[in-house]
C-alpha cells in the first residue's frame, strides 16, 4: 500500500497553492508518497481517515493551529508535523520555504529532531456534568460575550481559593503560546521546554494585575462571581470559539499528558529566535 502524507495549506496566503503543488509533486515523484490536500481556509466536510506518515502545514502560525485543531478533533495526535512558514513571525511554523526539500529528505532518512509540545486541557462543568472537554496547543481565553463588558471570576489552585479577577478576560497559556496573546497582554515568555503553564489577566481592574506561572502538576479552576455576574462569557481554544457559558459553570485547566510532535529544522537558540522574531 502506498504511503500517504497530509498537506494542510491556507490558500489565502499568496503563493500557497503553487508551493503546495510543488511539495505534492516532490513527494509523489521522489518519495512515492501520495498526498492528501486540505485547504484550512475553507470548511471541511470530513477528515480523511488515513494513516499518514506526517502532516505538512503551509502558511503561518494560524494555519498550524487550524491544522492542529483538525488533528485534535480526530484524535490523531501522534503524527509528526512539518510546519513551513509563509507568515511573518513563525514561532510554530519555523521551517523556511527554501528548506522544504531538505526537510522532507531528512525525514525519510530519520535524521530530524522531533520536539514534543504538550497540550493544555480544559473541562467545562455545570452542576458536575461535563459540557466541554478539549485541548489547546497555544492558549485558552475566556472573555465576556458582550462588547466592552468585564468578567468577574474566582480562581482556585488545586482546589484552594486563591484570587478574584475583574478584567476584560483571562488567558491560560502553554509555554508554546506564551509568545502570543498572553505576551501582548503583558505576560512573560516561557521557554517551550518548560513544564508548566501560565495565567494572564486581560486589562485587569484589580490589585492583582500580573501573570502567574504554574507547574504541570497544578490544576486551576475558574468560576464566575455570582455577586457581580453581568453576562455569559465565551471560551476560545487557539482562537476558535467553542461557545458561551453562564454563571453556574466551572472551567478547569491542567496540562495534558498528550503532546504533539513537531519536526525541528531550526538550529537557532531560544534567545536568538526571540531576538529575530520580536525585536
From Swiss-Prot:
Major enzyme class: transferase
Active site: 61
Subcellular location: Cytoplasm
GO MF annotation list: ATP binding; metal ion binding; NAD binding; NAD+ kinase activity
Cofactor(s) the protein needs: a divalent metal cation
Gene3D superfamilies found in the cross-reference section: Probable inorganic polyphosphate/atp-NAD kinase, domain 1, Probable inorganic polyphosphate/atp-NAD kinase, domain 2
Catalysed reaction, written as an equation: NAD(+) + ATP = ADP + NADP(+) + H(+)
UniProt-annotated binding residues for NAD(+): 61-62, 138-139, 149, 166, 168, 179-184
CC terms in the record's Gene Ontology section: cytoplasm
Record's keyword terms, sorted: ATP-binding, Cytoplasm, Kinase, NAD, NADP, Nucleotide-binding, Transferase
UniProt similarity note: Belongs to the NAD kinase family.
Function: Involved in the regulation of the intracellular balance of NAD and NADP, and is a key enzyme in the biosynthesis of NADP. Catalyzes specifically the phosphorylation on 2'-hydroxyl of the adenosine moiety of NAD to yield NADP.
Protein known as: NAD kinase
Source organism of this protein record: Borrelia garinii subsp. bavariensis (strain ATCC BAA-2496 / DSM 23469 / PBi)
Gene encoding the protein: nadK
